[in-house]
Design a protein with these regions (language model features):
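The feature marks proteins involved in alpha-glucan
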Residues: 1-43, 48-68
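Substrate-binding/active-site clefts of carbohydrate-active enzymes
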Residues: 47-213
Length: 213
């Protein structure tokens, strides 16, 4: 249920979310869309999109990578948000941006990789994509800056969220909050695995539906 967490998402933080708003955030709006038939979607992973050594992007692999303008590769091609603009897309589909479990945010100097389909805290941006995973406000502010920059570029944002399972049912925040409620179980009391990921959330139960929707 947390909306702010510290490094690796182990503890929630209490903060005024308004303090994380970038300048002019109150004026941020989705770009207009005349017809659904006009939609052109570009799927991207935060880290992959900007990590290349010749991307010309300063904040490689971070939310802020998508706020940098005027970046080019070593051979002069547009990169980053300028590349997205020249493609003429209407939407970016961002692979999981929420806090996920498999990347250790205390060791970002070491090679680690995951698409992010191992949710830990659904309502918090992942710290590995922020410039300081130890500060709860930084990841939120930088995520908002990214969204704001994309909107200003005329690009809508779609978030990829997987609610059908979590990283670890036994140690999940759901299970710690209400044991046995948020996950389906087999007749012998084991975690059901309809997702193929080791567990499956019980979307048929009222509070899980409310959480998702």
């Amino acid at each position: 249920m947390a909306k702010a967490v510290g490094v690796n998402g182990k503890r929630a933080a209490v903060l005024d979310l308004r303090s994380t708003d970038p300048e002019e955030w109150e004026n941020d709006v989705r770009p207009p869309l005349k017809n659904y038939a006009d939609i052109t979607v570009y799927e991207m992973h935060h880290r992959d999109f900007s990590l290349d050594s010749v991307s010309g992007i300063q904040n490689k692999g971070k939310f802020l990578a998508l706020t940098e303008q005027g970046t080019t590769s070593s051979s002069g091609e547009k990169t980053g948000i300028d590349h997205l603009k020249e493609l003429g897309i209407t939407h970016v589909h961002l692979l999981p941006s929420y806090d996920y479990a498999s990347v250790d945010e205390t060791k970002l100097d070491k090679a680690q990789y995951n698409w992010g389909y191992d949710p830990q805290n659904y309502n918090v941006p992942d710290g590995s994509y922020s410039t300081d995973p130890y500060k709860p406000d930084v990841r939120i502010r930088e995520f908002k800056q990214m969204v704001q920059a994309l909107h200003k570029a005329g690009i809508r944002v779609v978030l990829d969220v997987v609610y059908n399972h979590t990283f670890n049912a036994d140690e999940s925040n759901f299970e710690r909050t209400v044991p046995g409620y948020f996950y389906r179980q087999t007749k012998d009391g084991q975690w059901a695995n309809g997702s193929g990921c080791g567990n499956e959330t019980a979307s048929d139960r009222a509070m899980m539906r409310k959480y998702m929707i």
